[in-house]
């Protein structure tokens, strides 16, 4: 993480360095990103860079933390549902958060996609059991709760499903934005209230129908889907 000297900088200068770094990492991997490009675009001396950060990886980790922080900020802005969420409604809310992040912070979203592409999460370790799991560990807990609450069928391979949901969560947002622009013929507004946009909600609902048809415990849900 950055050195204390970085956090003592005036906010305007600190934000400038962060913005320049985000632009650099949006277009380049950690290995190919240039310290020279960052210091030149930020208007700082190269020696100052190393007063603020240990190395380029230190700055990169700081940008990844910014991504997490911005997502946490977005969670508080989306309206809470009136009732408790079932497994699939909870997943829909998570996807809305990802989409809001893509819309409001496109460069940070691009950094995150590049990071995920270059560092694919093919497995994770369960902190309680030590068991190696496929994909993002967050979805294993999510799916286990779904099975426990009878939202998800017991025959579902949660290891495989967790991996698939991880892939969906990382790459769905840019597709949805592009799809909305194609369908409407105009750019999506940055301040769009995604929770109220009917076209977007229709697309998300269709995705939920697909997932429910494959994983829901209630066989009637699958029957209804395939009869459409």
Task: Give residue spans per PLM region.
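Amphipathic alpha-helical linker/stalk segments
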Residues: 63-93, 110-113, 145
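Helix-turn-helix
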Residues: 16, 27-58, 62
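Generic hydrophobic, amphipathic alpha-helix propensity
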Residues: 13-21, 38, 63-71, 139
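N-terminal intrinsically disordered/low-complexity leader segments
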Residues: 1-12, 219-228
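Amphipathic alpha-helical packing segments from all-alpha helical-bundle domains
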Residues: 69-72, 89, 121-151, 159-163, ...
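Amphipathic alpha-helical segments used for helix-helix packing
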Residues: 90, 101-123, 177-187
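Hydrophobic alpha-helical connector segments
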Residues: 77-105, 158, 162-165, 201
